[in-house]
Design a protein with these regions (language model features):
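Positively charged n-region of N-terminal signal peptides that target proteins for export
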Residues: 1-9
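Sec-dependent signal peptide cleavage junction
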Residues: 6, 15-28
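Conserved C-terminal helix/tail region of periplasmic/extracytoplasmic solute-binding proteins
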Residues: 24-34, 39, 361-391
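Short, polar/charged alpha-helical segment
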Residues: 35-47, 60-79, 276
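Extracytoplasmic ligand-binding site segments that recognize negatively charged/polar headgroups
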Residues: 54-72, 83-97, 105-258
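A ligand-binding cleft/hinge motif common to bilobed small-molecule-binding domains
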Residues: 117-122, 264-285
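Periplasmic-binding protein-like
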Residues: 138-146, 153-157, 236-239, 280-309
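Mature extracytoplasmic/periplasmic domains
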Residues: 299, 303-372
Length: 391
């Protein structure tokens, strides 16, 4: 009898070790999910939910909550099992790095985050989260937007109070002139990472060359300086000298300019116009809709999806990301696509014709785009330069 029990114990240990060896890691599951159909992923997701799983996801953009609601309607057996929590950009990576793998209840299974350089540094490079992108979408999303996967682009534009008529802004170097002192509203870049990343991109070779051209067009002479490394640094210096930091959020900048002094201008998130009282919206003009601007008309930044390395529902995460990359997940009433200032990386998803906006392709040549690799490699020098001038 003892021998039989010993054999059974050994067999159980062998089976247990085999089960562990056969257990699929999150990374392996996401790799497998990339080539599956949505129907196959749904079956896998139902298995995860039946086993007690729940997809908790954090997002820096509130429209993700509506997308999650639509997702559960389209996949009814996942109803109430996709739980949204809004997270502020400034605390995103502090929360995620401290909770992923900690066993904290309702920690994120996936997140929609901005600030690509921090995503790379604190999560992806550390193996705390993984990128996932479906093979079925590779023909409609540019390769540059697949790893890490972009869910939406958001733009910030130059917008002004038109109470005194046009400000005739045709060149970004105008904003470095003394006449703009205190009249340009911009959120403190040391407290708003996408604003910081925008300024850092201006120091890159491509953008400094573009600013050199704008400089020569405006001043009638080539850019020359012994003080600044390139035209990007020079523009940042002049611009920040004029910035007014009274307002601490994009929504407050939008409403403050709309109800404030004519002639004031802000560089803020375009979609925040929805926060402005309807009676005041007539006071606001998007510079780019009035005329072309030498240099740029604002900037564009991505929101990425990333999957936590300890999620118990990787297939559900994959299905949800697939959904967000489609018209069903990105569009509809009260969605990203029904509002100004949000653009899908899926080139087949177009902005509604009745919306005062332009497609992604239009903005792609007029806005400064975030390059997470350039920022990651040049962060220290550019940050010090900017922080000193913010004061």
């Amino acid at each position: 009898m003892k021998r039989v029990l010993s054999v059974l114990v050994v067999l159980m240990l062998v089976l247990s070790v085999s089960a562990i060896a056969m257990a699929e890691t999150v990374e392996e599951a996401l790799t497998a999910a990339a080539s599956m159909s949505n129907e196959e992923l749904y079956e896998k997701a139902k298995e995860e939910i039946a086993a007690g799983g729940q997809l908790n996801f954090y997002s820096t953009t509130s429209f993700a909550e509506k997308a999650a609601s639509n997702f559960m309607e389209d996949y009814p057996e996942l109803a109430s099992k996709v739980v949204y929590a809004e997270i502020d950009d400034g605390e995103t990576y502090t929360i995620l790095t401290s909770t992923i793998g900690s066993g904290v209840k309702d920690a994120a299974d996936m997140a929609l985050v901005q600030n690509g350089p921090d995503l790379k540094t604190y999560l992806l490079d550390e193996g705390l989260s993984y990128s996932y992108f479906p093979e079925s979408m590779k023909d409609v999303v540019d390769e540059a937007n697949q790893n890490p996967p972009v869910i939406t682009f958001i733009n910030s534009l130059l917008i002004y109070h038109n109470g005194n008529g046009s400000i005739n802004l045709t060149n970004v170097w105008q904003l470095t002139e003394p006449e703009w002192k205190g009249k340009v509203f911009f959120k403190d870049p040391t407290k708003e990472t996408v604003n910081l990343n925008f300024l850092m991109m201006l120091t890159s070779p491509d953008w400094s060359v573009r600013l050199e051209k704008a400089y020569e067009d405006y001043y009638g002479a080539p850019f020359q300086s012994n003080e600044f490394k390139n035209a990007g640094y020079a523009w940042i210096d002049g611009f920040l000298k004029n910035v007014n930091y009274t307002y601490t959020s994009a929504s407050k900048i939008a409403t403050g300019i709309a109800s404030g002094a004519p002639g004031n201008l802000g560089l803020f998130v375009f979609s925040k116009l929805r926060k402005v009282d309807e009676a005041d919206r007539v006071n606001l003009t998007v510079v780019q809709f009035e005329n072309e601007v030498e240099g740029f008309s604002g900037f564009m930044y991505p929101v990425y999806a990333t999957v936590a390395n300890d999620t118990e529902c990787p297939y559900t995460c994959a299905l949800f990301i697939n959904y967000l990359l489609t018209e069903a997940g990105f569009g509809g009433e009260k969605s990203w696509n029904s509002n100004q200032g949000y653009y899908s990386p899926n080139k087949t998803i177009l902005k509604p014709e009745d919306l005062q906006d332009e497609p992604y392709e239009y903005w792609s040549t007029r806005l400064v785009f975030e390059d997470l690799h350039y920022i990651d490699e040049n962060y220290a020098e550019a940050y010090e330069f900017i922080a000193v001038r913010v004061g």
